[in-house]
Amino acid sequence: MGKKKMKLSSLFKGGAGGLLAVPLCYNAKTLSFRVGDDMIKTVNSVFFDHHHNNNNGGDLLEAETPESWFTNSSETASHSTESDQDLDAESLEMVVRGVVRSERLFFDPGVTSSILEEIEEKSKSDLKSKETVAVGEDRSTPIEEISVAVAMESEDPYGDFRRSMEEMVTSHGELAKDWESLESMLAWYLRMNGRKSHGVIVSAFVDLLSGLSDSGAGITSASVSDSARYSTAVSSLPSSPVYSLSQGQTEIQEEERRSC
C-alpha cells in the first residue's frame, strides 16, 4: 500500500497560487488611524506632502482631520525667530552705544610696557612732590601762621617789642638760624604797627640780633652788622617812616626840655 503524504497549504497563498490579498483601508476614520497619522505629521513639522501622496497612486488617502488638531509650528517658529532676531539686534546696538559713550574703547598708553614699573614711577614722583612741598613750607613759613597779633597799650613800647621778639625766637628756634626768617619777622612787625612805632621796632630788632650774636644762637656778626646798616640806612632816609618817627621823637624831647 502506498503511503499518503499530508501537505499543509500556505495561509498566504490564494486559490490561484498567488499572495493572499489583504484588503486596504481606504477610509481612515477610526481613532487609531488618526493618532498614527497625527504623530507622523508632528514629527515632520506638520507638513502635508501632497506630492508624495499623489505619487503613491492613490493607494493611501489622506485622512480628514480638523485643522484645530495641529498647530502651524513652522509659522510660530518663524515668528519667534524674527522677534528674537529683532531683540538681539536692539540689544547689540545698545551695548555698542554704551561702550562708546563710556569711553571704554579709549586708553592712554603708559610710558613703559610694565604696569609695576609705571606704578613705582608714579609713587616715586608723588613722594618727591610731597617732600618738596614739605621743605618749602618749612623754609618759607609765613610769620602769620606762627604768631597772633594782639593790640595793647604799652607804656614801654621798646621793652614790649623786644620781649615779643625774644619770645618768637625762643618758641621757634629756626628763626635764630635763618636770616631770611628774621627779616620776615621784622617786616611783619613793621606792617602790623603804625609808622610811629617803626623806630622802636627797628631798635628792638637790632638789640635782639646783638643779644643772639653774643649768646651764640646762630646769628653771626656779619648778620648783626648787616641789620645795623639796614636800620641805619632806613632811618636816614627822609621819606622813610622811621626817619619821620625819629624826627618827631627828637622834637618831642626838645619840647619837653624847653618846658622844664
From Swiss-Prot:
A Pfam family: Ovate
Keyword Ligase: no
GO cellular component: nucleus
Any GO BP annotation: negative regulation of DNA-templated transcription
Tissue: Expressed in roots, rosette and cauline leaves, shoots, stems, flower buds and siliques.
Keyword field contains Transcription: yes
Subcellular location: Nucleus
Main subcellular location of this protein, as a coarse class: nucleus
PROSITE patterns listed in its UniProt record: OVATE
Residues covered by the OVATE domain: 150-211
Cited InterPro entries: Ovate, Ovate_C
Keywords attached to this entry: Nucleus, Repressor, Transcription, Transcription regulation
Role played: Transcriptional repressor that regulates multiple aspects of plant growth and development through the regulation of BEL1-LIKE (BLH) and KNOX TALE (KNAT) homeodomain transcription factors.
Additional observations: Plants over-expressing OFP13 show small rosette size, late flowering, reduced fertilization and blunt-end siliques.
PANTHER family: TRANSCRIPTION REPRESSOR OFP13, TRANSCRIPTION REPRESSOR OFP7-RELATED
Protein known as: Transcription repressor OFP13
Species, as recorded: Arabidopsis thaliana
